[in-house]
UniProtKB/Swiss-Prot annotation:
Pfam family, one: RuvB_N
Residues annotated as binding Mg(2+): T66
InterPro entries: AAA+_ATPase, AAA_lid_4, DNA_helicase_Holl-junc_RuvB, P-loop_NTPase, RuvB-like_N, RuvB_C, WH-like_DNA-bd_sf, WH_DNA-bd_sf
Catalytic activity: ATP + H2O = ADP + phosphate + H(+)
Stated name of the protein: Holliday junction branch migration complex subunit RuvB
Organism this protein belongs to: Streptococcus uberis (strain ATCC BAA-854 / 0140J)
Enzyme class label: hydrolase
UniProt main location, coarse: cytoplasm
SUPFAM superfamilies: P-loop containing nucleoside triphosphate hydrolases (SSF52540), Winged helix' DNA-binding domain (SSF46785)
Binding site for ATP: L20, R21, G62, K65, T66, T67, E128, D129, F130, R171, Y181, R218
Similarity comment: family membership: Belongs to the RuvB family.
GO cellular component, one term: cytoplasm
Length: 334
């Protein structure tokens, strides 16, 4: 079953995100630390008439890494070529992409951690010295061809920075950690989206949506669409605080931005394991989810919000989890 709070793209969201995409850093809401650093590095590169150093953007899904890549290219005034790690299946695919670059272009590789190692190794000399050596022919007739490349900027995006090899990670001169958004920034994003799509919304409703969006613009915009639908059918089309509360209750999204799966995780820990510690594998089996799904999709937000702690012996539900789900604290094992 698809979760309304899933960070990954759903349905027509890729098209919608392109419509909403800001063009320049001054239009980009949130991620101030990353923006401020990039602003300096971009201006310095332009003053020297050089390509920007290679950039690695990392963080959870839905926080604007792809958007930031397009913004960087716009700020530099260059073209952006886009691909993804899984799409580059062999070294020849990457060679064709690199050979097509113009001087100063940006090459954006999403999910860069999923590139095959043979492909990754081709990138090393391309990133460091702007050349590649490729083998032409086969057997006794094969020969190495040295191919010079124009200076370019590689922007890699990943949700799993720890999966990058050390040689690849070391070749990125600039790193940007994309963090969960603050409520004020998300509120502004919701109101901007409402304005672009001509939705009538009151500020209190935008604020409530922001609070329940798990710090993620993609989720905020998705919830906004569903609340708009509810307001059109159950009200007069205006997205009010009352309409927002009722719609999100229908969608099982509570005031902390937790849905039924998040609550199931916490209830399992509390009811079956006295709050923990419980191993991730055991927990995954009990809620009928894959271990990687729990670790990548559910756990980060629960930890960030203080509902779960990681310990050497397993995961532990915090007092905040007990209070949120209205369990008496005297049932918690010390």
């Amino acid at each position: 079953m698809t979760r309304i709070l899933d960070n990954d793209l759903m349905g027509d969201e890729e098209l919608i995100e392109r419509t909403l995409r800001p063009q320049y850093l001054k239009e980009y809401i949130g991620q101030d630390k990353v923006k401020n650093q990039l602003s300096i590095f971009i201006e310095a590169a332009k003053l020297r008439d050089e390509s920007l150093d290679h950039v690695l953007l990392f963080g959870p899904p839905g926080l604007g890494k792809t958007t930031m890549a397009f913004v960087i290219a716009n700020e530099l005034g260059v073209n952006l070529k886009q691909t993804s790690g899984p799409a580059i299946e062999k070294a020849g695919d990457l060679v064709a992409i690199l050979n097509d670059l113009e001087p100063g272009d940006v090459l954006f590789i999403d999910e860069i951690h999923r590139m095959p190692m043979a492909v990754e190794e081709v990138l090393y000399s391309a990133m460091e010295d702007f050349y590649i050596d490729i083998m032409i022919g086969a057997g006794d007739t094969s020969r190495s061809v040295h191919l010079e490349l124009p200076p370019f900027t590689l922007i890699g995006a990943t949700t799993r920075a720890g999966m990058l090899s050390n040689p690849l990670r070391a070749r990125f001169g600039i790193t940007g950690h994309m963090e969960y958004y603050q409520v004020d920034d998300l509120t502004e994003i919701v109101e901007r989206t409402s304005d672009i799509f001509e939705m009538a919304i009151v500020h209190e409703a935008a604020l409530e949506l922001a609070k329940r969006s798990r710090g993620t613009p993609r989720i905020a915009n998705r919830l906004l669409k569903r609340v708009r639908d509810y307001a059109q059918i159950m009200g007069d089309g205006v997205i009010t605080k009352e309409m927002t509360d009722k719609a999100l209750e229908m969608l099982d999204v509570d005031h902390e931005g937790l849905d039924y799966v998040d609550q199931k995780i916490l209830r399992t820990m509390i009811e079956m394991y006295n709050g923990g510690p419980v191993g991730l594998g055991t927990l995954s089996v009990n809620i009928a989810e894959e271990r990687d799904t729990v670790e990548d999709m559910y756990e980060p937000y629960l930890i960030q919000k203080g509902f779960i702690m990681r310990t050497r012996t397993g995961r532990v539900a915090t007092e905040k989890a007990y209070r949120h789900l209205k369990y008496p604290l005297d049932t918690k094992t010390e």
